[in-house]
Swiss-Prot record:
CDD domains membership: AdoMet_MTases (cd02440)
Entry binding sites for S-adenosyl-L-methionine: 114-118, 137, 165, 180
InterPro entries on file: DNA_methylase_N6_adenine_CS, HemK-like, N5-glutamine_MTase, PrmC_N, RF_methyltr_PrmC, SAM-dependent_MTases_sf, Small_mtfrase_dom
Keywords: Methyltransferase, S-adenosyl-L-methionine, Transferase
Top-level division of the source organism's lineage: Bacteria
Residues the record lists as binding substrate: 180-183
One GO molecular-function entry: protein-glutamine N-methyltransferase activity
One Pfam short name: PrmC_N
This protein's name: Release factor glutamine methyltransferase
Enzyme Commission code(s) on record: 2.1.1.297
The organism of origin for this protein: Xylella fastidiosa (strain 9a5c)
Amino acid sequence: MPSPIALLTAATERIERVDAEALLLHALDCDRAWLFTHGDIPLAAAATESFQALVEQRARGIPVAYLIGRRGFWTLDVMVSSATLIPRAETETLVEQALQRLDHASERRVADLGTGSGAIALAIACERPQAQVLATDNSAAALDIAARNASAHGLNHVVFREGDWYEALLGERFDLIVSNPPYIAVTDPHLTQGDLRFEPPSALISGGDGLDALRILTAGAPAYLRPGGWLVMEHGWDQGAAMRTLLHTAGLVAVATVQDLEARDRVTVGRCPGF
């Protein structure tokens, strides 16, 4: 029977080492410390076959997050499935900007539109436990994953509703509306590359220029924000200028675009006047 290190070495001929390690840890249900202190022991046939099957799937392009069923985001280990977008590091910029505009007052109300796995809503709820957080999505399958994530992290006060964008808010108003909506143009060649090939198109594609969902969300925001409330939106690296125009057109003030850690436009914010 091969050892963990032998399996890992063989796998790196087909896939990236970081991916191979993640898959091996998953197949063995162990941590890195165990792996590298027991790296030379023979493995059972079942564990070997499980790992090799995962490597085969990864070699075909299936994202590691879908193969192991989870992804780290913020301080959370988030369950994901093919019904949800895979949380990405750049989206932590969105969470940071939301938290900067959300104090610890218990009456603060937050809506995360298009929550997917719930990563954004749960990160905010974790950092602002007094806030009333509502997370919405038009996918029942995604909401099921999000609710399971909330339960796993003891964030059972987060409320989930099914609905398309603002229809799920039922006319309520919020101190902060946050969203990472689809913002990729239907003709974007990146859709045929990498992990994007396997993620739900409805969570990625938004019309001919990628702005359809962003237009809906910015135009509708004033009707659902309290005076002084903030809209915080993630978007593509080349959409910052368009987003600022959309927020200004919607009547929001203090409009600004924030860059991610790679110095790319990633989040645009605006405040509802009247406060």
